[in-house]
Swiss-Prot record:
InterPro entries: ARM-like, ARM-type_fold, Armadillo, Beta-catenin. Signal peptide: none annotated. It comes from Anopheles gambiae (African malaria mosquito). It is a peripheral membrane protein. GO terms for cellular component: adherens junction; catenin complex; cytoplasm; nucleus. One of its GO terms (molecular function) is transcription coactivator activity. Belongs to the beta-catenin family. This is Armadillo segment polarity protein. SMART domains: ARM (SM00185). Pfam families: Arm (PF00514). Residues 1-24, 756-850 are annotated as: Disordered. May associate with CadN and participate in the transmission of developmental information. Can associate with alpha-catenin. Accumulates through wg signaling; arm function in wg signal transduction is required early in development for determination of neuroblast fate. Arm and Abl proteins function cooperatively at adherens junctions in both the CNS and epidermis. The keyword Repeat applies.
Length: 850
């Protein structure tokens, strides 16, 4: 055997030469040898490396070795060579016993003492290191033997047990069920049971026919054990076990309930055909009834079963509704803090929230407030489910009060780095601020405008975020006490350049449509007029108007020639007539500022305004066209340009319009155009006006001199309103008739991707025409109508003629309200009327809540 110097024992610092040291005596060498590990370890046991001791005694390592300089500390006496030999002999003789003690301790006789070879408690011996894998090997062999024994035993016992389970004596059946339950706890016998269809059928039969508690517990416990294996699930399903298990959901015994619901849960998760079988057996009703229990882990399993059954199945959703499921689910969200239960319950609510029947039930049960309680939960999956559900519900909750906590929480989560969280929060805020002044004020007071501006700035080109955020801002910047403040906040928060930039490509038409409405509202603030112009808003609006007008003219030419509607009539679900109306309406507000009028005039857009007066089938376009001409005609040169474009004839015809707004604007423009005419012409013109149905009161004319009246676009009637609710769902139809109609959305929404989620779409059709993707809730006919399925991105209320028929081919027209002729004056054109106080009154689609 050779010895090697350990690598960490260096002699480089030894000041003495070993050749100068005297040779120690044999006794001294023996004593120094005793200090090595051979004294306590043969080397075979520990595997320690032997080494030559230092003869100089000057090793640095030895200076710290207490055994080198304090012999009494390690040993109480010196050992002679004979004693060392005796110890080595004893260790050799007991080597086999040490190995046996480590590997087969059960074979040793009691009372035998085996000398230990472990010198250092921190260093296990070689035998000790081998002991653990040896024990594992031994147990594996034993288990293999026992497994085979269990399998053989079960195989031999199964035929007899089947007979006993079918016995008429219930005591015998009970004993047999308990025996089978015990066998099913072992893997080998469990496989033997599930491989026997006769045994599983006997268990199901015993479960169905017996009223004995022990029999029931044994049989259902066995089925529960089998349900952890796919083969067992198939055997239970084929044996008709699901109806028997559903029946047990009425059991008052906790253990039976646990076995039954967990077995059904496993079947629903992994066995094809189980969902239908559970529905047919009445499982939904029984599961909803179980929601009244208070064991959180049990409830988590029940709610997960409900989610599996309701997902993608409208009938199941209606059964849950009929069983008062929504109120129980909301109660759970309000009462517990167990994360898994809250998560599974929120998943059920998310599935139900796209059902038009369940949606109002959840809202009425306080679902919005209950879900809002968990927006600050550290569980991200719970927060996301709550947000998806809230967004699905939000179009049905536009009239719900007491949402201050929710609105504040939504503003907070707008700062999240998760794109899905921000998208949902913005969409919910958009819907909840639609036609609800209280919610608008609340959002403004908690910093919602600043948060939404920041969200738009940070979103970049993510339209799934920018579109709902722009819609929410559009609602917050008009028709409530804090609207003027909101308009200023957008400017002070550096939002104007970002918002105007969204009018450029690659923005899609639904987003552009929403931005146009927001710019119109922002222009209501005089301080925003110049910044909007400086950021290029007028130029971009005119460019969009040209594009939309060309497409509209092309469509009308095609319809006139062959009666067909070309594919290009819609772009991303948005009709170009909507863009025409929106851009002209925004230019109308911007034209109130003198320099803006000059810029608009220079864009060579007046001919288009005049041509729009001929859109007899779309009153709202006629109204905004007459409105912008009314503003531009303040300048005499522009009035002459308008007359030169041939506007006199269509304006004169519009004086007979049943829409007071159209008629009044037309009269105002004609009066401006007649300012340089003779006094006789003016008097004759005034006289003709008083003969029209809309202008019958002579007292309003102030001796034949026409002033300029208020902006009639905000004088509105409480007729059907188009609510631009932001939601998700397939393409929908905006109908001007009918009661509550909520959009049918998707059962669930992708968490990892927003692809395929059409957020926003085109305008609706008052004639029942298809809209673009992205259903939103909208208010139905008359003030009592509920939110319906309309499209997002803004649109107008459906204008109705005096005969009650729609006057617009798309859902964006709006008539002005009935007025006495004496109320019509033309004083103070620059004075804007107060916002309507009735939430059911809305302006054209580009106004706040459309």
């Amino acid at each position: 055997m050779s010895y090697q110097m350990p690598q960490n024992r260096s002699m480089s610092h030894n000041p003495y030469n070993s050749s100068d040291m005297p040779m120690p005596s044999a006794k001294e060498q023996t004593l120094m040898w005793q200090q090595n590990s051979y004294l306590g370890d043969s080397g075979i046991h520990s595997g320690a490396v032997t080494q030559v001791p230092s003869l100089s005694g000057k090793d640095d390592d030895m200076e710290d070795d207490p055994l080198m300089f304090d012999m009494d500390q390690g040993f109480s006496q010196n050992f002679t060579q004979d004693q060392v030999d005796d110890m080595n002999q004893q260790l050799s003789q007991t080597r086999s016993q040490r190995v046996r003690a480590a590997m087969f301790p059960e074979t040793l006789e009691e009372g035998i003492e085996i000398p230990s070879t472990q010198f250092d408690p921190q260093q296990p011996t070689a035998v000790q290191r081998l002991a653990e894998p040896s024990q594992m090997l031994k147990h594996a062999v034993v288990n293999l033997i026992n497994y085979q024994d269990d399998a053989d035993l079960a195989t031999r016992a199964i035929p007899e047990l089947i007979k006993l389970l079918n016995d008429e004596d219930q005591v015998v059946v009970s004993q047999a069920a308990m025996m089978v339950h015990q066998l099913s706890k072992k893997e080998a016998s469990r496989h033997a049971i599930m491989n026997s269809p006769q045994m599983v059928a006997a268990l199901v039969r015993a479960l169905s026919n017996s009223n004995d508690l022990e029999t029931t517990k044994g049989a259902v416990g066995t089925l529960h054990n089998l349900s952890h294996h796919r083969q067992g699930l198939l055997a239970i399903f084929k044996s008709g076990g699901i109806p028997a298990l559903v029946k047990l959901l009425s059991s008052p015994v906790e253990s039976v309930l646990f076995y039954a619901i967990t077995t059904l849960h496993n079947l629903l998760l992994h066995q094809d055909g189980s969902k239908m079988a559970v529905r047919l057996a009445g499982g939904l009703q029984k599961m909803v009834a179980l929601l009244q229990r208070n064991n959180v882990k049990f409830l988590a399993i029940v709610t997960d079963c409900l989610q599996i059954l309701a997902y993608g199945n409208q009938e199941s959703k209606l059964i849950i509704l009929a069983s008062t499921g929504p109120s129980e689910l909301v109660r759970i969200m309000r009462s517990y803090d167990y994360e898994k239960l809250l998560w599974t319950t929120s998943r059920v609510l998310k599935v139900l929230s796209v059902c038009s029947s369940n949606k109002p039930a959840i809202v009425e049960a306080g679902g919005m407030q209950a879900l809002a309680m968990h927006l600050g939960n550290p569980s991200q999956r719970l927060v996301q489910n709550c947000l998806w559900t809230l967004r699905n519900l939000s179009d049905a909750a536009t009239k719900v009060d007491g949402l201050e906590t929710l609105l504040s929480g939504l503003v907070t989560v707008l700062g999240s780095s998760d794109v899905n969280v921000v998208t949902c929060a913005a969409g919910i805020l958009s819907n909840l601020t639609c036609n609800n002044q209280r919610n608008k004020v609340t959002v403004c007071q908690v910093g919602g405008v600043e948060a939404l501006v920041g969200t738009i700035i940070n979103a970049g080109d993510r339209e799934e975020i920018t579109e709902p955020a722009v819609c929410a801002l559009r609602h917050l910047t008009s028709r409530h006490p804090e609207s003027e403040s909101a308009q200023n906040v957008v400017r002070n928060g550096y939002g104007l350049p970002v918002i105007v930039k969204l009018l450029n490509p690659p923005s899609r038409w639904p987003l552009i449509k929403a931005v146009i409405g927001l710019i119109r509202n922002l222009a209501l603030c005089p301080a925003n007029a110049a910044p909007l112009r400086e950021h290029g808003a007028i130029h971009l609006l005119v460019r969009l108007l040209f594009k939309a007008f060309q497409d509209t003219q092309r469509q009308r030419s095609s319809v006139a020639s062959n009666g067909s509607q070309p594919p290009g009539a819609y772009a991303d679900g948005v009709r170009m007539e909507e863009i025409v109306e929106g851009t002209v309406g925004a230019l109308h507000i911007l034209a109130k500022e003198e320099y803006n009028r000059q810029v608009i005039r220079s864009q060579n857009v007046i001919p288009i305004f005049v041509q729009l007066l001929f859109y007899n089938d779309i009153e709202n376009i006629q109204r905004v066209a007459a409105g912008v001409l009314c503003e531009l005609a303040v300048d005499k040169e522009v009035a002459e340009m308008i007359e030169a474009e041939g506007a006199t004839a269509p304006l004169t015809e519009l004086l007979n319009s049943a829409n007071e707004g159209v008629a009044t604007y037309a009269a105002a423009v004609l009066f401006k155009m007649s300012e340089d005419k003779s006094m006789d012409y003016k008097k004759r013109f005034s006289s003709e006006l008083t003969t029209l149905p809309v202008f019958r009161d002579d007292s309003m004319w102030n001796n034949g001199e026409l002033g300029i009246g208020p902006d009639l676009q905000d004088i509105l009637s409480p007729e059907q309103a188009y609510e631009g609710l932001y939601g998700q769902g397939p393409a929908s139809v905006h109908s001007s008739h009918g009661g509550r109609a909520f959009q049918q959305g998707y059962d669930t929404l992708p968490i990892d991707s927003m692809q395929g989620l059409e957020i926003g779409g085109g305008g609706g059709s008052s004639n029942g025409g298809a809209t673009g993707n992205g259903g939103m809730g909208g208010q139905q006919q008359q003030s009592g109508g509920g939110p319906g399925s309309v499209v997002m991105g803004g649109g107008g209320a459906s204008g109705m003629s005096s005969s009650g028929q729609p006057t617009s081919p798309y859902g964006m027209d709006m008539d002005v309200g009935e007025m006495e002729a004496s109320e019509l004056t033309f004083d103070h054109l620059d004075v804007m009327p107060s916002p309507p106080q009735d939430n059911n009154q809305v302006a054209a689609w580009y106004d706040t809540d459309l």
